[in-house]
């Protein structure tokens, strides 16, 4: 675990990523896609689905980062239709599959909050920290957050790329998150599971970034923590040192 004291200095607000940081699909993406294919009479191994999804999601992400990063609801809809089509090209009715998957991942029942999310949200509030949940997602995230008990009171704290008009790592995305908390970027810490979107991108926009590496697979040179419990402990330790 690598942290820097400078990461915490003068922090007044936190920008939290959503998927992979606060929530994850449950059942897994691979299982849901495989079951969708099965309903059309096509059997695909979950491991193969997982490999395809990671490949095409990453390809799409890289293509987006090379472009202007502009987005809206229609763009996100087209993006996910493209990804689903690439992951499940064998299906006789791809539009039906896409519609099923789009609806599925827009329901709270398709997601779970990590066990450390509820305590972390309460700790942020108790500490008087401003915070927002900021994600490359679309309007479906509002229903998802509203339906998860640990996050239900956070719907008014959402910053969603399709509503901002730009995806991470565009500077406007982080600026919008900071403005929503009424804070300067240098008073804001961004926390998430993607080195580019949650660390390097925020730093270019004047914020600070901290990687949440739940699977311990990320670059060691980036300041990171393994979970939200560690995030809260580190923040409390820093405050205790500052007031000692």
Segments (PLM) and residue ranges:
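Asp-based, Mg2+/Mn2+-dependent phosphohydrolase catalytic module
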Residues: 1-14, 24, 47, 92-98, ...
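N-terminal helical cap/lid subdomain that shapes the substrate entry/recognition surface
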Residues: 4-118, 122
């Amino acid at each position: 675990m690598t942290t820097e004291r400078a990461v915490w200095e003068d922090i007044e607000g936190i920008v939290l990523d959503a998927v992979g940081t606060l929530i994850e699909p449950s059942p897994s993406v691979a299982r849901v896609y495989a079951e969708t294919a099965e309903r059309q009479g096509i059997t695909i191994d979950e491991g193969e689905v997982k490999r395809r999804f990671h490949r095409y999601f990453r390809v799409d992400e890289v293509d987006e980062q090379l472009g202007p990063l502009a987005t809206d609801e229609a763009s996100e809809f087209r993006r996910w239709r493209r990804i689903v089509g690439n992951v499940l090209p064998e299906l006789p009715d791809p539009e039906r599959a896409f519609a099923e998957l789009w609806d599925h991942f827009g329901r709270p029942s398709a997601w779970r909050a990590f066990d450390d999310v509820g305590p972390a949200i309460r700790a942020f509030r108790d500490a008087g920290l401003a915070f927002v949940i900021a994600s490359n997602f679309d309007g479906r995230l509002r229903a998802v957050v509203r339906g998860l008990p640990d996050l239900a009171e956070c719907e008014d704290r959402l910053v969603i790329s399709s509503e901002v008009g730009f995806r991470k790592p565009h500077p406007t995305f982080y600026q919008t998150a900071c403005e929503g908390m009424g804070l300067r970027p240098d008073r804001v810490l961004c926390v998430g599971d993607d080195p580019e979107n949650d660390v390097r991108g925020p730093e270019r926009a004047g914020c600070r970034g901290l990687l949440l590496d739940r699977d311990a697979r990320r670059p060691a040179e980036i300041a990171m923590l393994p979970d939200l419990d560690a995030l809260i402990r580190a923040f409390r330790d820093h405050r205790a040192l500052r007031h000692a």
